[in-house]
Amino acid sequence: MNHILAIDQGTTSSRAMVFDEALTLKSVAQEEFPQIYPRPGWVEHDPSDLWSSVAATARAAVERAEIDGSLAAIGITNQRETVVVWERASGHPIHNAIVWQDRRTADLCHALAEAGHEPLITGRTGLLLDPYFSATKLKWLLDHVEGARARARRGELLFGTVDSYLIWKLTGGRAHVTDATNAARTMLFDIGRGIWDPEICGLLDIPMEMLPEVKDCAAPFGMTRADLFGREIPILGVAGDQQAATCGQACFRPGMMKSTYGTGCFALLNTGEERVTSRARLLTTIAYQLGGKRTYALEGSIFIAGAVVQWLRDGLKIIREAGETQGLALSSDAAQDLVIVPAFTGLGAPWWKPESRGAVFGLTRNSGPAEFARAALESVGYQTRDLLEAMRADWAAGAEGVLRVDGGMAASDWSMQFLADIIGAPVDRPVVRETTALGVAWLAGMQAGLCPGPEEFAADWALERRFEPQMEASVREAKYDRWGRAVRAVMAV
């Protein structure tokens, strides 16, 4: 028994991958599911869609791998912050899952901030008082579903992030657990003491009876139902998607950084045992927890990364598929200084201006599809530098001089070269791009005794290509200064 199933439950699709004990990918299955938008700014998922897509892809991946019953362990990684509440007795959700993107609790967050509660919340959880996180979404459910809070106090209702709900379903209701990285994203978890915070739960009137047990990222989370895979399989690894990618990128030393480019972008800087309080409105979070020991990180999130390419395709209709952007960027007029600030849903870290909206600067009569494509790709590099500048300002120990990248946009050579140019540092792209699934497969495999510990795993990390800065420093700083003026203009409107 020497294979590991990695379940990767994302925002728009569920994926499952089978790895062998050498962490070589053997099979992949993927299934998309519907997004639900009840009102502007509201985003929901039907929990039954999450479960059915996970169950279907897990079975399909195992079947395609042709591993003849040699599945030894399961790891789960997931979209973070999304909230599910379900009945303990039946397992039925009492409402759709409220997704991390959902902004319905913006007024509540504003009221809590006005009442002076943000220092307490940030000091304990490392997070900003924002609808992005789970706590106010959970309060909204308890406030708006009739009888929910009383039922929760009686122990009839359970709360979980997506990982917790999936473990409940996989184990047939035998395990109500989560891991430290997912707990750290709820805005209810004291990341210094490693416990659910009674004061914050009291402030939001959230019954602590409904909260899951918190475990290490590599730990026994429970055994699956025997009918799912022909026998019971242990769930041995769990981490939120960005923390799993941090492990998959082997960013185990303080100072190591990774940046994942999907719809948005998430950059994490390992700060080791030091819990750094950000002055630049970055998030302080748990990178991973192993053997009861927490390793911390600074995290910055960009709302729009790959989504700016989707806008070129679906909004402006100047490309038919994402792969066309690189060719267009290569053919663009370098003399034009078009700047796109893609604040379609506001500005993320380090600005946190949800009310800001996007803009295009430097438009001329000669600006065409090629210039728009280049400016769109450049915007991702500029935003990444914003995050890295904030991280350097926050942590005196400083980041190492190399950024490891993954995600869909990392496949673009042009984008990665510009990223190296604009941050003025090498950008490393790994051989294995599926770093999120790889990270949680490693966690589960390590707990199962199949995979090595962090040091040996890091030694096996393989570089596919390093992008070295080629842009002259004067050009780099002039371009970044132009970007800064554009962002300030957007925030001033």
Swiss-Prot record:
A GO biological process held by the record: glycerol-3-phosphate metabolic process
Annotated catalysed reactions: glycerol + ATP = sn-glycerol 3-phosphate + ADP + H(+)
Family: Belongs to the FGGY kinase family.
Alphabetized GO MF terms: ATP binding; glycerol kinase activity
Pfam families named in the record: FGGY_C (PF02782), FGGY_N (PF00370)
Enzyme class: transferase
InterPro entries, A to Z: ATPase_NBD (IPR043129), Carb_kinase_FGGY (IPR000577), Carb_kinase_FGGY_CS (IPR018483), FGGY_C (IPR018485), FGGY_N (IPR018484), Glycerol_kin (IPR005999)
Residue positions binding sn-glycerol 3-phosphate: 11, 80-81, 132, 241
Keywords: ATP-binding, Glycerol metabolism, Kinase, Nucleotide-binding, Transferase
Record's function text: Key enzyme in the regulation of glycerol uptake and metabolism. Catalyzes the phosphorylation of glycerol to yield sn-glycerol 3-phosphate.
Keyword Ribosomal protein: no
Enzyme Commission (EC) number: 2.7.1.30
Activity control summary: Inhibited by fructose 1,6-bisphosphate (FBP).
Protein name: Glycerol kinase
HAMAP family to which the protein is assigned, alphabetical: Glycerol_kin
Residues noted as binding ATP in the record, renumbered to the chain: 11-13, 263, 306, 310, 408
